[in-house]
Amino acid sequence: VTIAIVHLGAGNTASVQFALERLGAHAVVTSDAAVIADAERLVLPGVGAAGYAMTRMAELGLTDIIKGFDRPLIGLCLGQQLLFERSQENGGATMLGFIPGEVRHLDTRPDLPVPHMGWTRLEKLKDDPILDGVAEGAYAYFVHSFVCPDTTATLACADYGTEVPAMVRSGNRWGCQFHPERSAEAGARILHNFLSLPA
């Protein structure tokens, strides 16, 4: 299985590649439109700002290719946020629009720092192949200052003084707000499940 990890000039691409290769996948970090279009799976990692990511995607000629990609796709951290319509970040950014709603700044209790950084339990809300074998209450590693809206796409949430949609799905597109490549056994299981999805 050939996995294309989309490189937008920032992000945790090397650690994602290493995590996938440990599971036996052939993973390439690329911004080449032809490689991305032909991949059997697509990973959209990201750290940083939504507006910058979408601008780079457009500059590289990848926006329409990613929007039209019909095989399994997973967005990680910022990559999950990019699956939604809009973000408040950078004064407002238009995103891929697979899932309705606006990504907003994380508004939590005064005693909880933002960004949300560290290990937080996952609560599964729906059964989904991506969550097969992931224990209820498993810990995942989060680093984020913005949060996706809670929609019918939410598969799992985390409690950080407010409910954080931790995993989402729309058709053949999944998202993790956390970093599965840094989330020990639960993260490895989620990536294994992603590799095992039917194309």
Enumerate the language-model features and the residues they cover:
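Extreme N-terminal starter segment of soluble prokaryotic enzymes
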Residues: 1-4
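Short acidic/histidine-rich motifs immediately flanking catalytic phosphotransfer sites
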Residues: 36-46
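Structural alpha-helical scaffold elements that stabilize or flank donor/cofactor-binding regions
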Residues: 35-36, 65, 167
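Cysteine-nucleophile active-site neighborhood
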Residues: 48-117
